[in-house]
């Protein structure tokens, strides 16, 4: 696996792979990689001949008071994990390479609708930053396919809308959430948890499971289900941010006759904000 830092080197390497008739797969990341990221690379390697990953901690998607400066940088360990997962090329630019004219006058990409509410309400400007950097990376790499985790479900919906609306010839693949044995969704931010917090963190997923189980048993009072689950979260030590039941296909608020649902939540455990979601497929009427 080669590591390149400039757009010029990246394009030369991708052009060489294209000249050899290879399909290009792409996995964008911010580094501090775990088994969830590795699964994305493995899926890309199964679907494409040449896998490009990127590591770039994107300042545009961090709001005021968020954890940009303390976000872990673990390049050597990340390189080992990427290589083992089947990555062929790592693009590791700095901010000057990504935003050569600075970020103040940078063209921004906004995806209305799916980027609003949920994490979009809690983190103003976050999805604009995500959409902008992903658009730039897609133009830099020009992949045939790209893999994103379902763990960041709203982000995946934003990327799907972006690619569709801007007519990008890129297949977007959603990868299942990877979890620890106790159910906690793998996340780089889990490293911020104390031992005591880590022990109670799986309660976030259990609150989603309780809603899913009730839905499968015919419950349709969404407001009551949400209230009960948020009480569970508080009793476990969380401060809930949001918990909502949405249509899994378009992220609109769920209607009573919707069959494809997703339950999404964000909550703080101490100073660490965790997110999770659970897809719920209901049998037809």
From Swiss-Prot:
Residue positions binding (R)-pantoate: 61, 155
EC number: 6.3.2.1
Any matching Pfam family: Pantoate_ligase
Positions annotated to bind beta-alanine: 61
Gene Ontology MF annotations: ATP binding; pantoate-beta-alanine ligase activity
Recorded GO CC terms: cytosol
UniProt xrefs under CDD domains: PanC
Superkingdom, natural source: Bacteria
UniProt KW Nucleotide-binding keyword: yes
Annotated compartments: Cytoplasm
Record's catalysed reaction(s): (R)-pantoate + beta-alanine + ATP = (R)-pantothenate + AMP + diphosphate + H(+)
First-listed, main subcellular location of the protein, grouped into a coarse class: cytoplasm
GO biological process, one term: pantothenate biosynthetic process
Binding site for ATP: 30-37, 149-152, 186-189
Catalytic site positions: 37
Other remarks in the entry: The reaction proceeds by a bi uni uni bi ping pong mechanism.
Subunit structure of this chain's protein: Homodimer.
Family: Belongs to the pantothenate synthetase family.
Function in brief: Catalyzes the condensation of pantoate with beta-alanine in an ATP-dependent reaction via a pantoyl-adenylate intermediate.
Protein name as annotated: Pantothenate synthetase
Organism for this UniProt entry: Ectopseudomonas mendocina (strain ymp)
């Amino acid at each position: 696996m080669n590591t390149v830092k400039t757009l010029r080197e990246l394009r030369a390497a991708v052009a060489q792979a294209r000249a050899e008739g290879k399909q290009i797969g792409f996995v964008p990341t911010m580094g501090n990689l775990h088994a969830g990221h590795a699964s994305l690379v493995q899926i890309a390697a199964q679907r494409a001949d040449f896998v490009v990953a990127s590591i770039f901690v994107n300042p545009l998607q961090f709001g005021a008071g968020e954890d940009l400066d303390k976000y872990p940088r673990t390049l050597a360990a990340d390189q080992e994990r990427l290589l083992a997962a089947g990555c062929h090329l790592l693009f590791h630019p700095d901010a000057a390479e990504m935003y050569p004219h600075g970020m103040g006058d940078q063209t921004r990409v906004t995806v209305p609708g799916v980027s609003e509410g949920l994490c979009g309400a809690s983190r103003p400007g976050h999805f604009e930053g995500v959409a902008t950097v992903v658009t730039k990376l897609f133009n830099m790499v020009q992949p045939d396919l790209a893999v994103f985790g379902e763990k960041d479900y709203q982000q995946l919906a934003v990327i799907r809308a972006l690619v569709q609306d801007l007519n990008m010839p890129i297949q977007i693949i959603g990868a299942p959430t990877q979890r620890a044995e106790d159910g906690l969704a793998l996340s780089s931010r889990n490293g911020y948890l104390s031992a005591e917090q880590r022990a109670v963190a799986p309660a976030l997923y259990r609150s989603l499971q309780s809603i899913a189980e009730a839905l499968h048993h015919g419950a349709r009072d969404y407001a009551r289900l949400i209230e009960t689950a948020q009480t569970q979260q508080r009793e476990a030590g969380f401060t809930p941010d949001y918990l909502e039941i949405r249509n899994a296909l378009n992220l609109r608020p769920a209607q009573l006759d919707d069959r494809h649902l997703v339950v999404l939540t964000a909550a703080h455990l101490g100073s660490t904000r965790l997110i999770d979601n659970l897809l719920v497929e209901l049998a037809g009427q």
